[in-house]
Amino acid sequence: AEFLNRVYTNAWLKLPVGKARYGVMLREDGIVMDDGTTTRISENHYHMTTTTAQAANVLSHLEYYLQLVWPELNVNVVSTTEQWAGAAIAGPNSRALLMKLFPNTDVSNEGLPFMGYKEADLFGIPAKIYRISFSGELAYEVNVESDFGNFMWEKIIEVGKEFQIQPYGTEALSTLRIEMGHVAGSELDGRTIPHDALSLIHISEPTRLARI
């Protein structure tokens, strides 16, 4: 947690196990380097996400500070990008769909609140569920081991037919983020400070729909 405190602009020491938090990472000159969510999986185990374009740079950034600036911190970082396959499920029926996919897991608003995390079973496959919204709507991210990525996708599409589920891509996601006032990737172009991107406002004021 102390390491996260130093590399992000916001506080992490009191983040409880099973919860995620949005963070903004700055360069030494105060320019936004990246943003993303980090989840506390267990007492000393965190799962950090980054933007796709900056994943390698963020890993190098973290390793540099651990090895040369704060060697006293007992922290190890490892990329798990290739180990997990993820799917974002968003929209007003996303919770109803999750209830079908995970019938033995409580995904109600009380059981899995906004920015919450749970481990679950997807038709016999271990899965991780994050209550995270990239578009401002009620949304979740489901991760499984990469070998089961196709299996997960097929199950989501199959079970989602009764909800008229439709795949959406990055262009649609970017439009949704702009409509909801979220920071879009094009705004983090290496010339942006947090105030310009209104990042800190979005940290403290998540959209109402995402919290229902």
Region roles according to the model:
Residues 41-204, 208-211:
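Conserved, structured C-terminal
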Residues 1-45, 49-68:
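Extended, compositionally biased flexible segments
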